Amino acid sequence: MDGNHNKFWSLALSIAMMLTATAASAVEENFDALKPGTLPDDWTCGVTGKGSPVWKVETDTSAPSKPNVLKQTGSGTFPWCVKQLVRITDGFVEVKFKPLGGREDQAGGLVWRFKDGDTYYIARANALENNVSLYHVEKGRRITIKYVHAPVTTNQWHTLRVEFSGKAINVIFDGKRYLGLENDQITGAGAVGVWTKADSVTAFDDFSYGGQ
């Protein structure tokens, strides 16, 4: 009995230490200390494919953490904005986003294991299609892994989170896990960031990430 008791507490302590370490490594950015019309110095923005995306910090009175958000108002095949100097192999990335408009798409997404504009993973939610999707990009080509129906509302804040470890990928939207699977197309450390598609006008806030 004592042996089992000790094993239980040893396991509980190990789990607590793991959770503490993960929480300690988490970083959150809300863009509120930045001047509207600017970009954070440590973010790099671009596009996979063609187009002219426009990323900048703007004031938004509806922001989950007021007053500022990071907003994409231009258009391009797949616009992205990443924390280029962050390198995470296994961990999580999360953001609150609000799809504001777009005739072709109204998407907000996350990227991780981002090597460059041609190689990375994407999880995204789309208000026009009402779904959550998982992709990987290789040689600049977006490849669908899986998508599922999900209620995504325009002009409403949503939370998108991805947890990734080895081959395992879990995509959580508004607190519910919609995708849980294994994929090993992209391995090793990479940057993390946010993503849109086509003419999506999307606001982002409370971007957070952490490594295991």
PLM regions with names:
Residues 10-20:
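Bacterial N-terminal signal peptides
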Residues 31, 93-95, 155-171:
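Short tryptophan-centered beta-strand motifs in secreted/extracellular beta-sheet-rich domains
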Residues 36, 72-133, 138:
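Secretory/extracellular carbohydrate-interaction modules
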Residues 38-69, 76-77:
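Extracellular glycan-recognition surfaces and repeat-rich motifs
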Residues 138-159:
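Short, aromatic/His-centered strand-loop micro-motif at the edge of beta-sheets
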Residues 172-193:
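Short, solvent-exposed beta-strand-to-loop segments that form ligand-recognition rims
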